[in-house]
Amino acid sequence: MATNGVVISCLREVRPPMTKHAPSMWTDTFSNFSLDDKEQQKRSETIEALKQEARGMLMAATTPLQQMTLIDTLERLGLAFHFETEVEYKIEQINAAAEDDGFDLFATALRFRLLRQHQRHVSCDVFDKFVDKDGKFEESLSNNVEGLLSLYEAAHVGFREERILQEAVNFTRHHLEGAELDQSPLLIREKVKRALEHPLHRDFPIVYARLFISIYEKDDSRDELLLKLSKVNFKFMQNLYKKELSQLSRWWNTWDLKSKLPYARDRVVEAYVWGVGYHYEPQYSYVRMGLAKGILIIGIMDDTYDNYATLNEAQLFTQVLDKWDRDEADRLPEYMKIVYEFILSTCENYERDAAKLGKSFAAPYFKETVKQLARAFNQEQKWVMERQLPSFQDYVKNSEKTSCIYTMFASIIPGLKSVTQETIDWIKSEPTLATSTGMIGRYWDDIGSHLRESKGGEMLTALDFHMKEYGLTKEEAASKFEGLVEETWKDINKEFIATTNYNVGREIAITFLNYARICEASYSKTDGDAYLDPNVAKANVVALFVDAIVF
């Protein structure tokens, strides 16, 4: 016992193996950007004029298929927010009308997906007419690529109990992957290619919009008005993003943390990408900036616990942060004083912003989520450094916090008009929508972390916990986690619609859904991490902020 005590005591003074993070790829790329206000105003006026024509098109669409196809195109092009009232009006018309018995697979699936994505209750029984007596989709459907794609996209808004939609995923993926697409229109080919990588419902909305604009302009059946509007709109937003990013970069550079805390990541641009993913629409400037700052706090904390602090230092930092008192800073090592000041100062600015925006009630909650996150990071560090393997259930409970979902949501509350104190009370109850979206990110991160960290054999990951508890191989555990991702998405889909019963607005529900979407795009299909490894996020940064759209 005495020997064990000495070992544990010594272990608490050991620093974790330090990962040398790649430097920022962007340094001063955006900090000196200057927006031409006159040109931006001209774009705004052009958008308004084109919107009037597009609105007329939408309201003139009379048949359900015309309405659904146009709404789908507007959403794919990143334009639907301009017509929110009109789109919801049309969606309600589509929902109120009985489904046309003559709807083919394409139309049936499109209607089903759009209604669910707009939080309407619609039964998956609408697909019964396409299955045989054994409950299998009819093989005659396999030659209808457009219908298969529509069903594939619709199947990804399913719930756990909807077995027909899981069958639809398997059926459509099998046939789409094996389809001869050479004779299909370019638009269909490109949609299929992207969908097999990232189903539309799970895709990064504004990144997809940028991609779809480039596909749409090559389509012979394109609408020139919508194409022009989408290009001017994207150019307008791209310049707005670059302006915000320049302001954020200058703020970040004043702290000079990349030299003061060399163990920490310098990822201001990557953090801002997440902000754009949460809400890309122009009116959500505070959400984008606020989330980026929240993520930078999280990143500094994560790297401090995971990449540098000893167990004793981490425990002390957790205690000091819990007191939230500058007078306590003298108890900390010098490098931790810098971290502590960065957190407190950023939160003080948040508190002032919240007061100006009529959201003073948000500040105490934001502080509490930061403290909560510190405790969860500290627990995770103990498990790893002391090589303890918690039960999978204990891991999941702690991971709901280290997913950072609560801190990230709290960081943007001042920029969300619909959030009230009642919203915060709802989130504090840890609703399924919040916990499930958080776990999507956690599961994908754990899969990638295991592939990265186990290469060096130094760090324990969540897959190690699962392998030991259930006697699985690494491959089996990774497969199990990917299965957990799929099932958790089904919970998100169900709760996204159910929030309409909790008096939780669409703005809030979309925020949580978009967190899961960004995680899916950032972590899946790779062993990289779009925040840890700048090369993973590079394509999104270039598409959103660097590449100019060609008119």
From Swiss-Prot:
CDD domains: Terpene_cyclase_plant_C1. Keywords: Cytoplasm, Lyase, Magnesium, Manganese, Metal-binding, Plant defense. It is an enzyme of class 4 (lyase). Mg(2+) 2 binds at D302, D306. The keyword Metal-binding applies. Mg(2+) 3 binds at D445, E453. GO terms for biological process: defense response; diterpenoid biosynthetic process. It is found in: Cytoplasm. Mg(2+) 1 binds at D302, D306. Gene3D superfamilies: Farnesyl Diphosphate Synthase, Terpene synthase, N-terminal domain. Its cofactor is Mg(2+). Its EC number is 4.2.3.67. It catalyses: (2E,6E)-farnesyl diphosphate = cis-muurola-3,5-diene + diphosphate; (2E,6E)-farnesyl diphosphate = cis-muurola-4(14),5-diene + diphosphate. The Asp-Asp-Xaa-Xaa-Asp/Glu (DDXXD/E) motif is important for the catalytic activity, presumably through binding to Mg(2+). Belongs to the terpene synthase family. This is Cis-muuroladiene synthase.
